[in-house]
Regions:
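Cap/lid segment of the alpha/beta-hydrolase catalytic domain
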Residues: 29, 37-127, 137-138, 184-187
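C-terminal catalytic histidine-bearing segment of alpha/beta-hydrolase fold enzymes
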Residues: 239, 245-280
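Acidic catalytic loop of the alpha/beta-hydrolase fold
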Residues: 224-232, 263-265
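N-terminal cap/lid segment of alpha/beta-hydrolase-fold proteins
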Residues: 1-33
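Mobile cap/lid helix-loop segments that gate and shape the active-site cleft of serine hydrolases
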Residues: 108-116, 124, 131-132, 169-210, ...
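Alpha/beta-hydrolase fold nucleophile elbow
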Residues: 140-153
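Glycine-rich nucleophile elbow surrounding the catalytic serine of serine-hydrolase chemistry
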Residues: 151-163
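Short beta-strand/loop motif that positions the catalytic acidic residue
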Residues: 213, 220-222
Length: 280
């Protein structure tokens, strides 16, 4: 069962919120809810939440095992998602009187706009994700004390920052966003404006940022054949995060899904992970 809401994410700005309810929910029952963060792609939240109404959407889902917002709802969780700025229904190409971006990435354009106002794309998206979570926590059937967050690639970035900035999330799954800055940032130039903040990597590397989630439970997905975040440096990132969890005395709260696929959701441990840590 899918609901589509129009919500205010800040003053004078609205977004579409999708909510998937499990079919077996009973009246008056409370279930854990998971924020399903989408990554790059013109369709935004739609394939993640199971919209397969066009060949392009079906191709997105097949390429990245991308419909985790649908699958997790089928496994009993309430799931929800919004479009981050510049994606899906919030893509400027869909707005009246838009100006073509001449082939430039909307992520980078929005980052430039945000920095001129003293903000970043990450901070804006986190604020909008928190606003969506505020709404979801008031919906019938949602147990606001059992929230999780998960996402692939750019959605992995957002999963990381949502977990860090909103302690309501009790468990997180970061998919195909593990690496070292020298590798994905400098060697591969595999990042965009929705994934960075000024001066961040003078202070710490990506494993350090992921380690800040400790002691809360964290599941990391790494694709052996991922061409975006290469497995060698992705695993080095994981090993450094593992050291942080060991130092915190919570090694049991860190899990790895090292799957044989490319840049996509492994899906091998997600159900058990969230059911364990969201008490379901």
């Amino acid at each position: 069962r899918r609901q589509r809401w129009i919500i205010d994410v800040q003053q004078h700005l609205s977004a579409i919120l999708l909510v998937n309810y499990p079919r077996d929910m009973k009246r008056g029952e409370k279930r854990p809810a998971i924020l399903a963060c989408h990554g790059h792609g013109v369709h935004g939240k739609e394939p993640v939440m199971g919209n397969d109404s066009s060949p392009a959407l079906r191709q997105d889902i097949a390429a990245h095992n991308y419909n985790y917002g649908q699958v997790m709802a089928e496994q009993g969780f309430i799931t929800y998602a919004i479009d981050w700025i510049g994606f899906g229904e919030r893509n400027d190409n869909n707005k009246p009187n838009h100006r073509p971006q001449s082939g430039r990435d909307w992520c980078n354009i929005y980052y430039l706009h945000a920095t001129m106002l003293g903000m970043t794309s990450i901070s804006i998206n986190v604020a909008h994700g928190k606003a969506a979570t505020d709404v979801v926590c008031k919906l019938p059937g949602v147990d606001e004390k059992r929230l999780g967050v998960m996402g692939l690639s750019g959605g992995g970035t957002m999963t990381l920052w949502m977990a860090l900035c909103d302690k309501r999330f009790k468990a997180a799954e970061i998919m195909c966003y593990s690496d070292l800055w020298a590798a994905f940032g400098i060697r591969d130039i595999n990042y965009c404006g929705m994934q960075v903040a000024p001066g961040l990597f003078k202070l710490m590397d990506l494993p350090d940022v992921q380690g800040l989630i400790a002691p809360r439970p964290l599941l990391i997905d790494i694709g052996v054949h991922d061409t975006c975040f290469k497995v060698d440096t992705a695993m080095e990132c994981y090993r450094q995060v593992e050291k942080i969890y060991r130092a915190a005395g919570v090694t049991e709260n860190l899990e790895l899904d090292l799957h044989a696929g490319e840049h996509g959701w492994g899906g091998n441990k997600s159900e058990a992970f969230f059911k364990k840590h969201l008490s379901f």
